[in-house]
Amino acid sequence: MSVFFPHADFKRIYQIPTEFFQQRGLTVALLDVDNTLTTHDNPTPHKEVLGWLERKLNSGLRLMILSNNTQERVAPFAEGLGLEYIADAHKPLGGPLRQALGKLGVRPEETAVIGDQIFTDILCARLAGCTAVLVEPMEPEPMAFFRVKRTLER
């Protein structure tokens, strides 16, 4: 299978059931922020996402944010949720993802990477041997570069 194809896809992150993780032996989910947990520049997740995060944590799934966005954007967002994070992750490069796995003490086979972009989130997950989960972006991309990239992803 191509490194550009996710193992699974969902419209929104909050539509991924707990059983999805349990049936695959996944104990960790690494989460993108913008257009996955919330819209760009929004300091808090949508209420449906908050409920999803709580249900996943209560199920025993460990969550961590892995974002290409800046420390200034990611830190307050993650800290507000009580989640560990890695900002400036440079996905699809695998260094920060391997750092996250080491920090959490898990193997790639136990880990899902969830995000809205094929050329960053999905490629990063596939190259590392993690389960790649694609969600649709929460809103259209505001910048021309991202709009072109989205067209290529389709």
Question: What does each of the following model-derived ranges do?
Answer:
Residues S2-L31, N42-P43, K47-R154:
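Asp-based, Mg2+/Mn2+-dependent phosphohydrolase catalytic module
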